[in-house]
From Swiss-Prot:
This is Large ribosomal subunit protein uL23z. Belongs to the universal ribosomal protein uL23 family. It comes from Arabidopsis thaliana. NCBIfam families: PRK14548.1, uL23_arch. One of its GO terms (molecular function) is mRNA binding.
Length: 154
């Protein structure tokens, strides 16, 4: 076997290396000193480092949540007490017992969808027995007496 050839291209030429070092010294790149930071405060706060937003290995919500309150669950039944009848006649207002979780906007939307009527405003209260009562005031172009007849209250 013949002796292994020595690769001369990998080793840098000493003359070229010296010229490169001399050029660096002349330009001042090799010996630039970093200015020392003067600390004026006694306490040292560690600098903030990069915090990447964490992403989980799997989604925490498996499925989209379904709407637990639909229009039929919001309005339970209309009240037919004597005071409720007086509200229908005098104030153009219908009185409903509604789900405890329903808010005024949901009640308004449910009345609009189920009975095709526009509401002016909705007042709610929670009764001592734990149920929610809603006073639904109708707009002047709807008559509460006619709507009550259509629903079957009267």
């Amino acid at each position: 076997m013949s002796p292994a050839k020595v690769d001369t291209t990998k080793k840098a030429d000493p003359k070229a290396k010296a010229l490169k070092a001399a050029k660096a010294v002349k330009s001042g790149q090799a010996f630039k000193k970093k200015d020392k930071k003067i600390r004026t405060k006694v306490t040292f706060h560690r600098p903030k480092t990069l915090t990447k937003p964490r992403t989980g290995k799997y989604p925490k919500i498996s499925a989209t949540p379904r709407n637990k309150l639909d229009h039929y669950q919001i309005l339970k039944y209309p009240l037919t007490t004597e005071s409720a009848m007086k509200k229908i006649e005098d104030n153009n207002t219908l009185v409903f017992i509604v789900d405890i979780r329903a808010d005024k906007k949901k009640i308004k939307d449910a009345v609009k969808k189920m009975y095709d009527i526009q509401t002016k405003k909705v007042n709610t209260l929670i009764r001592p027995d734990g149920t929610k009562k809603a006073y639904v005031r109708l707009t002047p172009d709807y008559d509460a007496l006619d709507v009550a007849n259509k629903i079957g209250i009267i």
